[in-house]
């Protein structure tokens, strides 16, 4: 065995072996327990970042561990390869998105192989290929036939100068990223999938996800947002018009003093006909940012319509206002306003001088609304026949009254909206719908699928090539002229079912049900918590759609979910002559002074700029603080990078990148290598005879088997990989100090190293692959099983007993593990420190905690 640890040489050799033997290619085997481990597939942006490396290292550790459990393990990989970044890069580099994407895939594929991830590359998919999106298009037509797809107008970001739709990220401070024109909101027809039809099931089935993080489940419950309330009808005074309002607080209905409607509400448009101020306000609302964060932060404004609504219970008239905080596409586009019991309504009423009438008070006191709204539930007053009722009693009574009079009904609502899947972009899967010359809209016939996206295009940076090319849209259906849909799918469509396609990636059908039902559901899914409410919800929804189409037989796509934390690194900047921040890469920074806790006080870059240190923040291009995985692998080897990633922090917490810690991981592997080298150089190893071991050898073997048990539990049940590694490191420290003179010393070291190498194999597989054979074991390490715990080794021959007199420590004694209470008591009483503190006293009681403590009570 070579003395020096040379990762580049070792890793290249081992990776070539895996490739030549197709080690990680798997097929269905009914005689083996399956395990499907999946990490969220990457977008091929050009290079892997450390966030990818962390995600995929966790997945690989889990996969390799399960393989050593004797399971049939599937760990596939692919590329989430449609999306806007490819269009932007194509425009910038004067190319088309396709070649840019495929070049990135090739480069990143080599990076993944360089890191030693055990993927079944025979199942590789790229979502931008017709072989993949063909079946997505087919499935969409089936959903349309089932009535789960529809088209309606919806608001988009519109650049009037370029006459094109903009994605949210292309709107910078309300202006077009390209020409700086003020962006407008425009209503255009778009396709939707009825996820709301599954809202109740998606919500209820969260309770079955026992091995998903509570945080993700809570976020999904809130996103789905089930509420129970009453939908009530308000008449418009002086007309036969009416409109509906939904509220979850019907107990406050007697305190309604005005009604607020959305700028897009029919009543708002009607009232604006002779009201220039309202016209201007409606335009302002239409062009406002309607994201939740923006809505929460913006100033609440309104304009009176001049119309009044008739209260459905009291018959009083209340004014109707247009408010910028009401959205047409949420609820009914109208809200009842009770300023005494809603803080937003309170502030709005104060601002515009509207009435505030309290109708709820605490059970045991008076209500004070002089400074703010009283928003708690309490008892009703100033509410006519409902006075004195609590929330639930008032809810029921008001519901009964409105229902009897035909003015309202109890209703369950969801915050969740139907999934808009239309994107006015080029680089996506074409939506397989056509419009005939007579205006009939229909799905593309199956024999015309896939609708192929042309890849040889010129990007002008303004309009999608399939929108500007009028010929592409033309087609013929049953001899009739027809026009293809020129919108493409939201890229969440591709990522919602890729996990299932891996089960039969080359099938001439969407899924091979037999293969899908062998592998699914995914046993372990790994990805960032930022995907909790979008991808992970669509992922669950799509699985139910696949189930209801007869393609899978399970209810949920993944049994267990691990959400890994972000990777952080130091961030530094200086202000240039224009006052703008220039972020400097950590590799270009020299730290000149630190405080007593090691924190940076003074730092400069290579050009002498004095830098501001902002602390640790997420690795990103914007802060120029990313660390290139390639550089780290070239410098230390893939196994070192993997070990650091798994050891530096628990997987769900943020990981702070410290190169000094990477160096520490590298030293540990070199120490392991040296320990194995020295053991092999020490000569032939005899058979281990556990019956002839001395006390020190038994203790070392006990530590070995305790470590095996702990590491297995840490990896499988607790998923605390960092503590598993810490246990192995502690054991290695003991092994390095262990004697190696006798045959049984050497035999015990052989057993220990064989076990340690298998424990570490999922984490540092290249090193362990080589060491396994160097230690004289036959065959590849992938073909062996996880070390078994020898329960007999855990049995201790002796126990250390703490001896106290009146609760104070007076001695420590070692007794046989099976010693009786009487024997322990006799040994304890004979100790000098015990004799000294009991000789002039009467022993009143002796308390013995078996194997731990002897307490003598004397006075």
Curated annotation (Swiss-Prot):
Keyword Protein biosynthesis attached: yes
Entry's Gene Ontology cellular component terms: cytosol
Class of the enzyme per the UniProt entry, highest EC level: ligase
Primary localization: cytoplasm
InterPro entries named in the record: aa-tRNA-synth_I_CS, aa-tRNA-synth_Ia, Leu-tRNA-ligase, Leu_tRNA-synth_edit, M/V/L/I-tRNA-synth_anticd-bd, Methionyl/Leucyl_tRNA_Synth, Rossmann-like_a/b/a_fold, tRNAsynth_Ia_anticodon-bd
Subcellular location: Cytoplasm
Top-rank taxon: Bacteria
GO molecular function: aminoacyl-tRNA deacylase activity; ATP binding; leucine-tRNA ligase activity
EC number, as in UniProt: 6.1.1.4
Disulfide bonds: none
Residue numbers covered by motif 'HIGH' region: 42-52
Key words of the record: Aminoacyl-tRNA synthetase, ATP-binding, Cytoplasm, Ligase, Nucleotide-binding, Protein biosynthesis
GO BP terms, alphabetized: leucyl-tRNA aminoacylation
Placement of sequence motif 'KMSKS' region: 618-622
HAMAP family cross-referenced by the UniProt entry: Leu_tRNA_synth_B (MF_00049_B)
Family as reported in the entry's similarity comment: Belongs to the class-I aminoacyl-tRNA synthetase family.
PANTHER family documented for this protein: LEUCINE--TRNA LIGASE, MITOCHONDRIAL, LEUCYL-TRNA SYNTHETASE
Protein name: Leucine--tRNA ligase
Organism this protein belongs to: Shewanella pealeana (strain ATCC 700345 / ANG-SQ1)
